[in-house]
Amino acid sequence: MCDEANPAKPWQLPDVVYGNGIPALCLLHQEIEQFYNYIRSTPTEFCLRAGAVRRIEDVVLSIWPSASVDLFGSFRTGLNLPDSDIDLVVYYKFWNPRLLHELQNELVSQGVTDPDTVTVLDKASVPVVKFTDLISRIRFDVTFNSVASGVQAADLIKDFIRHFPELPKLVMVLKQFLSLHGFNEVYNSGGVSSYALTLMVISFLQQHARSNRRLSEHSKLALLLIQFLDYYGRKFDFFKYGISVLGQGGCVEKARLRSTLGENNWQSVLCIEDPVTPTNDIGRSSYGVLGVMQGFGAAFVKLSKLVDSDSSKIVGPILANIVEVPQSIINYRAWVHYNFQHLLTPELPCADSLVQPSPTGSTSPSASASASEDERSGGPATIGFGRCDDPPQNIDIVADLANLKMN
């Protein structure tokens, strides 16, 4: 059913499948699968990113030969959108704020970036050099020494991905949703970071797993997405509870987090306990979370009405009612594939191998890179975690929807 996608919008199912009586939840489930397969990095995009990372590492080592560079964030976990930035950390024992400007100058002098795209935030809580790589047009954030926990967090996320195969598919849809509504930037709009969103999804999946509810493999992603939007958009009390993934995960009364997060941190509206550094509240800067909550609630209403409608009257994509891919992203990906397919190699590296090992000594498997249809003639390329498909279970889709309404 997904073999012949819409050529103009490859993340959508072919028009012919709509209006044929296929249950809406089945359609939405397949649309989420299709969207995930489309939006994640292709081998060409992965190689372009890998090359950009190595260029930055070469610049760093040309300045400080004894330094080391490590990768963290969404590119390390495989949860990056096509336009996501890349997060790097430089470990150097002779730290000084001047290093930020030294790196800035060297990146410009070696032709890696344009001076107009470089920003040095030396007064930020985590000082960072932000710039755009000229060749790939990929944005970078480079920090120094202070985010070893970021590498550990990325590896922890990969462990959760192995445990919850639905996690990356839900996260990618939700990340695109936040991006479209301008809620993905913490620094500029008080939105929800990629890490915070991922922890929210993990906590939700942990609670769902404890409920022992078995969902049909043909509609699982649709039900989980709708339930997530309902939970955080209409039911979760952000003022009373914090979010945790430690142990069995779930919601924790904020008052109970006071001892670990401190007198001030635990009072943020979006309170998320950092599983790597429990004294850190991941959501403390997300002052726009109430807007995010309203967006989730509105998306729930849209999707729930559609999946509850007569399936014979569904004439187009369901997911498109809350998620779209801007033409600028489509154009960028076309540009990448036209100009950089020569970067493909028989065996793609994993993200962890792109840079020197960090002081944490992390060696866990790396992120996934996937192939677009035109690159899969030799079979899909998989890096790190693979897909985990459980055997189909004989659960009635209608019963799944009925249970959703009851909850």
From Swiss-Prot:
InterPro entries: MTPAP-like_central, NT_sf, PAP_assoc, Trf4-like. SUPFAM superfamilies: Nucleotidyltransferase (SSF81301), PAP/OAS1 substrate-binding domain (SSF81631). It holds the Pfam family MTPAP-like_central. Mg(2+) binds at D85, D87. Residues 354-390 are annotated as: Disordered. This is Inactive non-canonical poly(A) RNA polymerase protein Trf4-2. Keywords: Magnesium, Metal-binding. PROSITE patterns: SUGAR_TRANSPORT_1 (PS00216). Residues 357-371 have a biased composition (Low complexity). One of its GO terms (cellular component) is TRAMP complex. The lineage of its organism: Eukaryota, Metazoa, Ecdysozoa, Arthropoda, Hexapoda.
